[in-house]
């Protein structure tokens, strides 16, 4: 809301000019429609670039599970059409978006991948010291199925004396988080939905063996 108010102030102060570009790093953002509204009302030609992470168009995402599609689908289509460039990490996610929302003009949908190079520099250069730990790096949402991991973790602890860590349940700094990954032997995922997969990639770079669903 504060960002939208700041952008509205820039329009009001005549600081937004023809050719200006907006990059919105999560497309599910009301600012996009507001930017489009203000720009067209004031006859200012701007470009809007947006990154789609997830939405109600994905039946396994939290929005897909909770949102009423009678309004969420038209809203996602409106956001897509308001943007000049819509970015998706993979062909799979772009195609899901286009198919489930019945997008007729796919010329605005681009596969961008994600910039992971910084992880290689930051993580691969640090030595690891492994312990018998299985780590769960994901959000505690239904699409990540944390209860499945908790069940497995209890068996590992009781029968094999293997410790498990759910990072989202701990108040870790980034440095502590990476230290946990470097100490863990295995990184576990049972996610129904994965977009960036950054937690598994971080785990891999920290030397943890990834275990993921066979989908």
Q: At which residue positions do the language-model features occur?
A:
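Short hydrophobic beta-strand element within catalytic cores of glycosyltransferases
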Residues: 209-213
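Aromatic "clamp/platform" in nucleotide-sugar-dependent glycosyltransferases that forms part
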Residues: 192
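Active-site proximal beta-strand in glycosyltransferases
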Residues: 21-26, 40-62
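Donor nucleotide-sugar binding/catalytic pocket of nucleotide-sugar-dependent glycosyltransferases
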Residues: 81-124
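Membrane-proximal helix-turn-helix segments that form the acceptor-binding/catalytic region
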Residues: 65-86
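Conserved donor-binding/catalytic core segment of Leloir-type glycosyltransferases
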Residues: 116-157
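Short alpha-helical segment that forms part of, or immediately flanks, the ligand-binding pocket
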Residues: 178, 201-205
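N-terminal pre-catalytic "stem/leader" segment of glycosyltransferase-like enzymes
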Residues: 1-39
